[in-house]
Amino acid sequence: MSDAVSADVISRLKAVLGEGGWSEDPARIAPKLVEWRDRWSGTTPFLALPRTTAEVAAVVGICAEARQPITIQGGNTGLVGGQIPQGEVLLSTERMRTIREVSVLDDVITAEAGVTLAEVHAAAAEARRRFPLGL
């Protein structure tokens, strides 16, 4: 796949993401193009950094309408390289950092996609609960 994302798609993505919600800066993007074990590397001309699920939906809608592939990246901890773009728009969940709810009654934590496991563990511990997943 090439780094050919149309100027129209990029313009529309910038409009819905607003200031701070995107980057075309190679230095900002570079750490997201290499898998943590340095086995996989890739390219992207555009990094989308949505803060809300509404912004994610808007990015996906724009890209779907334009038939523009997207790679989603969370913590970049995958083991098979699926989080590394090969020319697609890269959508990072890193700014989606809210723990929305800790329900002691239901033993449920609702967290956005960019919340780290360490943060989920801390929220659970604060509620005198344990989140039984680790890496």
Give each language-model segment a name.
Residues 36-39, 81-85:
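Short glycine-biased active-site loop of nucleotidyltransferases that positions the nucleotide triphosphate
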Residues 1-35, 43, 65-68:
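N-terminal accessory segments
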Residues 22, 29, 79, 99-102, ...:
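Short clusters of hydrophobic/aromatic residues that line enzyme substrate/ligand-binding pockets
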Residues 13, 38-70, 89, 93-135:
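N-terminal glycine-rich flavin-associated loop
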Residues 56, 79-80:
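Short glycine/serine/threonine-rich phosphate/pyrophosphate-binding segments
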